[in-house]
Amino acid sequence: MDDFTLRPSALPTWSQRTALRLLNLAGWTLRYKPLPGPHGIAVVYPHTSNWDFPIGLLGKWALGLKFRWIAKDSLFRGPMGAIMRYWGGIAIDRRASMGATRQLAQTMLDVKWCWIAITPEGTRSYRPHWKSGFYHLATTARVPLLLVYIDYRAKVLSVADTLTLSGDQEQDMAAIAAVYEGRQGLYPDQAAPIKLAPPRDPSEPQRRRA
């Protein structure tokens, strides 16, 4: 255990203590350091399993923080949509433009407290790089990153490491990779390398989506 390990006795409400005890009973440790401000982007990595969601949700309930999270809009269809939104979900269209990024950044800053959780891999399956949306959103809104990891090898859910982006993508991604070094998802071979996709050549035709 380290100085950031959270214990049930330190939590103020019964529901928070219960959520943390459930995590502890499952063998998990929760690390937490107070957030650096009222707005920011929580980057969650690695994301290789559906089990990440209930583990993360218990951590969210234990901390008593109303983290919002982003997921593709198709997951919000039907009766589950209302439940997903109640749990903090924000539906997004994956075809969204930079204009939509600016709009989301302003929406986040217009409220008193808003931290948005994003899985930069965008999928539980392997992909060769991270999606860059989290980076553009953080730099547009000028907010810090919270680097959350779900490490199945050590059974640690960590909500403790933060980073203020410099705007130098290479430098920033190296700093992010240093925090996540050695952290292992449930299916390690499905975790994406910690790097952003190279910029698209504007001369190439844009692929049409089905």
Regions flagged by a language model, labelled:
Residues 1-10, 14, 18, 97-210:
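Non-catalytic C-terminal accessory region of glycerolipid acyltransferases
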Residues 4-6, 18-24, 43-49, 69-70, ...:
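Short acidic/polar alpha-helix capping motifs at helix-coil junctions
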Residues 11-47:
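Helix-to-loop junction immediately C-terminal to a conserved catalytic motif
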Residues 21, 58, 82, 106, ...:
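Surface-exposed charge patches
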Residues 33-96, 152:
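Catalytic core of membrane glycerolipid acyltransferases/transacylases, capturing the structured
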